[in-house]
Amino acid sequence: MHYVLARITVKPEAADAARQLLTTLVEQSRKEEGCVSYELYQQAATPHVFQTVEQWKDEAAAKAHMSTSHVGAAIAAAGPLFAAPPEILAYNKLA
């Protein structure tokens, strides 16, 4: 299994728009071949900070996800909302 965790910090006034955009991205991503799970969280104390937790069949599926049209569209739409570049970390499950 291959896991991807993305921390997304948007401008405080953009939290609602980001939540809508990210929710749509999650719904589309869950339909992809190789997607085991894809979850979105909003930080309780800081609602303009989001976390995705993605589980993919393998690294190839995660890489394919990044080249889909819906990811490209989401990145383009989210650009003006970002307060900082997203932190994206990939992990391989060991145990």
Report residues per predicted region.
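Short arginine-rich
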Residues: 76
